[in-house]
Amino acid sequence: MARSIRKGPFIDHHLISKVEAAIESKSKKPIKTWSRRSTIVPEMIDLTIAVHNGKDHVPVFITDNMVGHKLGEFAMTRTFKGHSGDRKAKGK
């Protein structure tokens, strides 16, 4: 279910304040955040945000195609190592 338009996008206050500070200082340093639930807004374009995936911070460079999505969508939390193959086929 989508969020109501009248409410606007959800962004944590501490994250938006860090974004505004980075824009003011024109800093290219990654902004570290644990807020995977925050929506990407147009002010974040061309910034690098390091999103926590449960283990470490994954740097995500924000482009215009990402606007409207959540930060957590771009930092995978699970690593897929691949299914084990058929052992008989490997031996031949």
Swiss-Prot record:
Keywords: Ribonucleoprotein, Ribosomal protein, RNA-binding, rRNA-binding
Assigned GO CC terms: cytoplasm; small ribosomal subunit
S-S bridge residues: none
Gene3D superfamilies per the UniProt record, alphabetical: 30s Ribosomal Protein S19, Chain A
Pfam families the record matches: Ribosomal_S19 (PF00203)
One BP annotation, GO: translation
Coiled coil stretches, renumbered: none
Domain of life: Bacteria
Keyword RNA-binding: yes
Keyword Transmembrane: no
InterPro entries with a match to the protein in the record: Ribosomal_uS19, Ribosomal_uS19_bac-type, Ribosomal_uS19_CS, Ribosomal_uS19_SF
UniProt-recorded Gene Ontology molecular function terms: rRNA binding; structural constituent of ribosome
Protein role: Protein S19 forms a complex with S13 that binds strongly to the 16S ribosomal RNA.
Similarity comment: family membership: Belongs to the universal ribosomal protein uS19 family.
Record's protein name: Small ribosomal subunit protein uS19
Organism of origin: Legionella pneumophila (strain Corby)
